[in-house]
Amino acid sequence: MRRLCIILLVYVYATFATKGICKQDEDVRYMGIDVVVKVTKKTSGSDTVCQALRTTFEAAHKGDGANDSLSTEYVDDYSEEEEYEYDESFLEGFVIGSTYYTIVGGGLSVTFGFTGCPTVKSVSEYAKGRIVFIRLSSDAPWRDTNPMSINRTEALALLEKCETSIDIKCSNETVSETTYGLASLAPHITQATERGNIIGSTLVDTDCVENLDVTVHLGEMCRKTSDLSKRDSLKVKNGELLDDDTFSIHTPKLKACN
C-alpha cells in the first residue's frame, strides 16, 4: 500500500508539473527532438553498452572581420572533447551550429550530428546479441531544470533548419560500461502526419551492419495537436536503402549513458 501511495503521489506531481509549465502564453513553444536507432549487426558481439560518450559542439559566428571566428575549449578528460563556438542567431539557447554525440558500445561506434536542432539531454543504449538500440532525446520541459521556450516564428525556423546525420562504424572497444540506471522517459512530441526531411548524411559500415532503422520526431512537447512538428525515417536492409516510412521503433529498457 505504501508503494502504491508513493507511485500515485509521483504521478500526481508529474501531472501538475506538466500542466503548470505547459499552460503559459499561447505563443510559448517548447520544442524537442527524439531519435531512435535500431541496428542489426551481421554477427553477435559485445553486449556492453555506454563504453564511451563524447560530445563536440561546433557553431561558427561572424566576428569583426570578414571570416568566421572560432572559440575552442578542451576539457582535461581525454575521453571527452568539447568544442564551443558561438552563434548570434535569434534562437538563443539552442545550438544553431552542429553538435556531435559519439556513443561507443555493443560493438559499434555511432556518431550523431545535430545541426540547428533542439538540445539533446538524454543518451541511452541497449545491446543484446546482434541487436543494438540507441536513443537520443530532449528533456520534457517539466523535467528540464532550465527549459528553453521560443515563439511560433522561431519554432518554424527551427523546423526548417534542424538536420541530423549518422555515422555508424564497427568497434572493438573493450572499456567497461558507464551507465546511470535506466534511461528516463522520452518526451512526448506532437505526432506529425507527414514526413519531412530531417535525416541528412548517413554513413554505415557494412562490414558489421546488416540492417538499420532510424526514426526522428521533431516538434512541440506540450501540445496534443500542432502543426509545428516533423518526422523522418530511414531503413537500410542488407546494405540497400529502402523507401519505407517507419513511424516508430519499439525499444526495450535502455540504459542511460549520461
Curated annotation (Swiss-Prot):
Show the Pfam families listed in the entry.
Orthopox_35kD (PF02250)
Its domain of life? Answer: Viruses
Q: Which InterPro entries match?
A: Chemkine-bd_vir, Orthopox_35kDa, Pox_vCCI-like_sf
Q: Which UniProt keywords apply?
A: Glycoprotein, Signal
Signal peptide span: 1-17
Glycosylation (residues):
N67, N151, N172
What family does the database annotate? Answer: Belongs to the poxviruses A41 family.
What is the protein name for this chain? Answer: Protein T1
What is the species of this protein?
Rabbit fibroma virus (strain Kasza)
